[in-house]
């Protein structure tokens, strides 16, 4: 996944959301316009109602990754194979079952948060 960098958030206010699968952080409008660079199989740029299903405004911390493949922090957070960009340290919500099924169909691993 992701050689090209993901969009960085254009604002760091309350409109930020994090992808529940890969934890990429962008604004609602950025997810609406271009989807999630790491999770194209969700097709959220085509189905705007899905943004609420696969992203959350409830997350802890942000880390920016310029070269995730070489970063020990990216490996520790399990985001080393994702596109360079801004990621949350943790999300507290699980991906809905329907979206987990989409991950299975796409043969993409989903690791739910440890504490919900």
UniProtKB/Swiss-Prot annotation:
Principal location listed in the UniProt entry: nucleus
UniProt keyword Transcription regulation, yes or no: yes
Gene Ontology biological-process entries: regulation of DNA-templated transcription; transcription elongation-coupled chromatin remodeling
Span of zinc fingers (C4-type): 19-39
Superkingdom of origin: Eukaryota
UniProt-recorded Gene Ontology molecular function terms: zinc ion binding
Alphabetical list of SMART domains matching this protein: Spt4 (SM01389)
InterPro entries referenced in this protein's UniProt entry, alphabetically: RPABC4/Spt4 (IPR029040), Spt4 (IPR009287), Spt4/RpoE2_Znf (IPR022800), Spt4_sf (IPR038510)
GO CC terms, sorted: nucleus
Similarity comment text for this entry: Belongs to the SPT4 family.
Record-given protein name: Transcription elongation factor SPT4 homolog 1
Species this chain originates from: Arabidopsis thaliana
